[in-house]
């Protein structure tokens, strides 16, 4: 693992970083050397092709001993001033092959570009249609569920409605409008009145017992006043009865004194 890391680091430094710095110095010179600039252009062309096929080579021939070290040496060979292997590889291998197959390569590139564009348009249209149909189906499903829920709530029995109302939270109960109270049945009201009359008849005796005779009261239940007027005493417990009792007491006190 450590050896692979060091090899990759050397490839990045010696194959990319240092050549990029040398190319920068060549471009920024006051008097640009065309041959040197052409050399670095050829180097970056070879490096791009090597980077494109490097993964395939790593998969098939990475088992060779000193494979990573050979890559580092090859990159140094390409740009080293005394060897300048870039010119040799470019002039002897790459340039003849590209000159022979340049038109065919251009045609293949144009065909691939057209096929890629057709492929993109085809799948874009399919995905757009599928997405539109899926969106419409989703809206239809939501609408059907809402209609079904409203129909089920309308056909729900009153008992289940009461259960659902009891299951609501206090906030929901406060927000709900008060429902009108149903009138009580007439039979239940009559039975309640009868039971109330029975309870009151058991609790009191009617007619009430007659009080003991007092002075000034005759056998007919009338009170003889000072003027000899008979005042009937037929409402027990009323204020008039209390006033008559006080009057009797005062008369009874005054008679012995006389």
From Swiss-Prot:
Superkingdom, natural source: Eukaryota
Region span, Disordered: 153-258
Protein name in UniProt: HVA22-like protein j
Family: Belongs to the DP1 family.
Regions of compositional bias (Pro residues) in chain numbering: 206-215
InterPro entries: TB2_DP1_HVA22
Compositional bias annotation for Polar residues: 156-169
């Amino acid at each position: 693992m450590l050896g692979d890391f060091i090899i990759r680091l050397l490839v990045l430094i010696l194959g990319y970083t240092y050549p990029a710095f040398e190319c920068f110095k060549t471009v920024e010179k006051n008097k640009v050397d065309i041959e040197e600039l052409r050399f670095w252009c050829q180097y970056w062309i070879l490096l791009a092709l090597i980077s494109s096929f490097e993964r395939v080579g790593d998969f098939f021939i990475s088992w060779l001993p000193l494979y990573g070290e050979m890559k580092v040496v090859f990159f140094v060979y390409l740009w080293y001033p005394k060897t300048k292997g870039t010119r040799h590889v470019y002039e002897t291998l790459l340039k003849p092959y590209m000159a022979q197959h340049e038109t065919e390569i251009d045609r293949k590139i144009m065909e691939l570009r057209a096929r890629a564009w057709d492929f993109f348009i085809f799948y874009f249209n399919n995905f757009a249609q599928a997405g539109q149909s899926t969106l419409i189906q989703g809206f239809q499903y939501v609408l059907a569920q809402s209609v079904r829920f409203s129909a089920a709530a309308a056909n729900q029995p009153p008992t289940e409605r009461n259960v659902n109302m009891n299951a609501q939270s206090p906030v929901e109960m406060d927000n709900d409008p008060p429902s009108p109270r149903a009138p009580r049945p007439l039979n239940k009201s009559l039975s309640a009145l009868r039971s109330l009359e029975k309870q009151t008849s058991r609790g009191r005796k009617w007619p009430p017992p007659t009080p003991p005779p007092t002075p000034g009261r005759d056998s007919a239940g009338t009170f003889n006043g000072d003027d000899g007027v008979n005042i009937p005493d037929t409402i027990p417990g009323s204020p008039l009865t209390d006033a008559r009792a006080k009057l009797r007491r005062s008369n009874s006190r005054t008679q012995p004194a006389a």
